[in-house]
Amino acid sequence: MGSSTSTPAPPPKKNKPEGRKADNQILNSYQKSIVRNAWRHMSQKGPSNCGSTITRRMMARKSTIGDILDRSTLDYHNLQIVEFLQKVMQSLDEPDKISKLCQEIGQKHAKYRRSKGMKIDYWDKLGEAITETIREYQGWKIHRESLRAATVLVSYVVDQLRFGYSRGLHVQGSRETKEDDEE
């Protein structure tokens, strides 16, 4: 397997119309307010319920995800998803914190590529499941700006998770190549 010494560059932040938000912000203040309200509504339904809805949707979109999420760890993952989303909501004013969190999680999951067959597109399935769950939990309250804000945030989160995952694969590949050279 060929090895490169460079690490992939982080994904660029999405371009938004000028004047809508501060330079380094993912969402403008109105969008943050909408997303926070949606999250409050979702988390009132019970955190594990929200997490299990997301997990169930992911597995429905890609059945092989169920192979990675052992039945014995489903409850754990349901709670982890909710805790992750809670941290994202708490950090909406600090996009660098969101990036770091997502990249760390993505990188930690790289080890599952070889052992369980995890693929990078599973992060997309997670994003789709989160977006659908937000739509469901908002019910009749849905309006365009709310969906747009959720989509922008989820896209950013997924891009950062994918970047961390790719970086983790790169680090693993470098380690494996080094180990092969030493043998």
UniProtKB/Swiss-Prot annotation:
One of its GO terms (biological process) is oxygen transport. Keywords: Cell membrane, Cytoplasm, Heme, Iron, Lipoprotein, Membrane, Metal-binding, Myristate, Nucleus, Oxygen transport, Transport. One of its GO terms (molecular function) is metal ion binding. A lipid is attached at G2 (N-myristoyl glycine). Changing G2A: Abolishes myristoylation and transport to nucleus. Plays a role in electron transport. Utilizes the bis-histidyl hexacoordinated complex with iron to transfer electrons to cytochrome c and molecular oxygen. Plays a regulatory role in the periodicity of the defecation cycle under oxidative stress conditions. Not involved in imparting protection against general conditions of oxidative stress. May participate in redox reactions under anaerobic conditions. This is Globin-like protein 26. It comes from Caenorhabditis elegans.
